[in-house]
């Protein structure tokens, strides 16, 4: 094994909780009670990223050992609904819903509560643990926001599933409301327990991806959600043309924000977008990226989301070996995912149990 990976294994042995068995820690090894290991350093992450391809299985083994020690054998699942689609004024280079692109993506107004209820019930019946209401655009109007809160209260009372919202910016003012700072608290009161808002990429690479809002708006929204007591779900998209330095920069920003859950997406190139010409990441590079994020974030939920079918193909089940402990299942915003039953069967075949929903409400 590469000496760097051997050192990481030794560190893992020193920091796992008592009684936890992993491939790299013997029961007799001295351990601290609850070592506050926050993960490897940025320099170490870049070193792991640059190890030769022949080391990939060892990299995955170390990441899986960290996952096993810190997150256990259980996984989380989530599904989303495209509750408001298209006509987005942002110019995100990857996005089929941007009005700056001609992609033929679906366009529709905010779905009503009955439609959202049907989507949530379908996912709950399949055993999915969380349901996300996702809308296009920088932020919702006050009327739209009120409608989402009304629907959330209905879902909270009718469906046994955790509720997540992804409604754009929360922390800046709007012409209609004057203050979106209250929105996070209103969502929590309505039964939403988690707020999703991706940074998409590193601050230093962001101008290559989006020019219609500043990176600090996204940072402020994540912080606003956390201040309101919502779990924060925040990650990005890999394969936009960023370097490993950018990926590690993003991961360290997420560590600074102390987010609860990190969704990792992979670019699914859509014709008509500025990145429609790009090729998907090679599968082994994608798995290495998941492993690096796990080593940087040993305590957090890491979910593999959009683009996994295109990027990973037959390697999709390996995301757990790479350190992930969750999947987004079903369809995505404008692209079809794998059949829901197929994903749930894969989880069962892998012996990956599901985190009880009440176990997801508290911070890891």
UniProtKB/Swiss-Prot annotation:
[4Fe-4S] cluster binds at residues 88, 92, 95. Residues 70-308 form the Radical SAM core domain. Keywords: 2Fe-2S, 4Fe-4S, Biotin biosynthesis, Iron, Iron-sulfur, Metal-binding, S-adenosyl-L-methionine, Transferase. Binds 1 [4Fe-4S] cluster. The cluster is coordinated with 3 cysteines and an exchangeable S-adenosyl-L-methionine. It holds the Pfam family Radical_SAM. SUPFAM superfamilies: Radical SAM enzymes (SSF102114). One of its GO terms (biological process) is biotin biosynthetic process. Residues 14-36 are annotated as: Disordered. Its EC number is 2.8.1.6. [2Fe-2S] cluster binds at residues 164, 233. Its cofactor is [4Fe-4S] cluster; [2Fe-2S] cluster. Coiled coil: none annotated. It catalyses: (4R,5S)-dethiobiotin + (sulfur carrier)-SH + 2 reduced [2Fe-2S]-[ferredoxin] + 2 S-adenosyl-L-methionine = (sulfur carrier)-H + biotin + 2 5'-deoxyadenosine + 2 L-methionine + 2 oxidized [2Fe-2S]-[ferredoxin]. InterPro entries: Aldolase_TIM, BATS_dom, Biotin_synth/BioAB, Biotin_synthase, Elp3/MiaA/NifB-like_rSAM, rSAM. SMART domains: BATS, Elp3. It comes from the Bacteria. Pathway: Cofactor biosynthesis; biotin biosynthesis; biotin from 7,8-diaminononanoate: step 2/2. HAMAP family: BioB (MF_01694). Homodimer. Catalyzes the conversion of dethiobiotin (DTB) to biotin by the insertion of a sulfur atom into dethiobiotin via a radical-based mechanism. Belongs to the radical SAM superfamily. Biotin synthase family. This is Biotin synthase. It comes from Nitratidesulfovibrio vulgaris (strain DSM 19637 / Miyazaki F) (Desulfovibrio vulgaris). The lineage of its organism: Bacteria, Pseudomonadati, Thermodesulfobacteriota, Desulfovibrionia, Desulfovibrionales. The gene is bioB.
């Amino acid at each position: 094994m590469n000496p760097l990976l051997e050192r990481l294994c030794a560190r893992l042995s020193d920091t796992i909780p008592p009684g936890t068995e992993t491939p790299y820690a013997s029961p007799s090894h001295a351990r601290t009670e609850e070592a506050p290991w926050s993960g490897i350093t940025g320099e170490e992450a870049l070193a792991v990223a640059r190890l030769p391809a022949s080391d990939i299985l060892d990299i995955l083994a170390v990441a899986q050992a960290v996952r096993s020690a810190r997150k256990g054998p259980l996984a989380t699942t989530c599904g989303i609904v495209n509750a408001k689609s298209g006509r987005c004024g942002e110019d995100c280079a990857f996005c089929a819903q941007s009005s700056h692109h001609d992609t033929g993506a679906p366009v529709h107004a905010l779905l009503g509560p009955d439609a959202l209820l049907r989507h949530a019930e379908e996912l709950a019946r399949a055993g999915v643990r969380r349901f996300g209401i996702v809308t296009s655009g920088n932020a919702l109007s006050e009327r739209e926001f009120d409608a989402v809160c009304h629907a959330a209260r209905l879902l909270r009372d009718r469906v046994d599933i955790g509720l997540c919202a992804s409604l754009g910016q929360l922390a800046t003012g709007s012409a209609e409301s004057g203050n979106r700072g209250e929105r996070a608290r209103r969502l929590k009161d309505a039964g939403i327990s988690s707020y999703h808002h991706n940074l998409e990429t590193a601050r230093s690479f962001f101008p290559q991806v989006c020019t219609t809002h500043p990176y600090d708006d996204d940072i402020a929204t994540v912080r606003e959600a956390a201040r309101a007591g919502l779990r924060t779900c925040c990650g990005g998209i890999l394969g936009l043309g960023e370097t490993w330095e950018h990926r590690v920069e993003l991961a360290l920003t997420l560590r600074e924000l102390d987010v609860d859950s990190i969704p990792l997406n992979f670019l699914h190139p859509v014709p008509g977008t500025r990145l429609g010409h790009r090729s998907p990441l090679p599968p082994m590079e994608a798995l290495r990226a998941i492993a690096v994020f796990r080593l940087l974030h040993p305590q957090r939920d890491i979910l593999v989301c959009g683009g996994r079918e295109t990027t990973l193909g037959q390697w999709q089940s390996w995301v757990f070996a790479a350190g992930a402990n969750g999947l987004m299942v079903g369809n995505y915003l404008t692209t079809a995912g794998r059949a829901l039953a197929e994903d749930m069967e894969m989880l069962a075949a892998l012996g990956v149990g599901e985190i009880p929903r009440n176990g997801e409400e508290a911070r890891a």
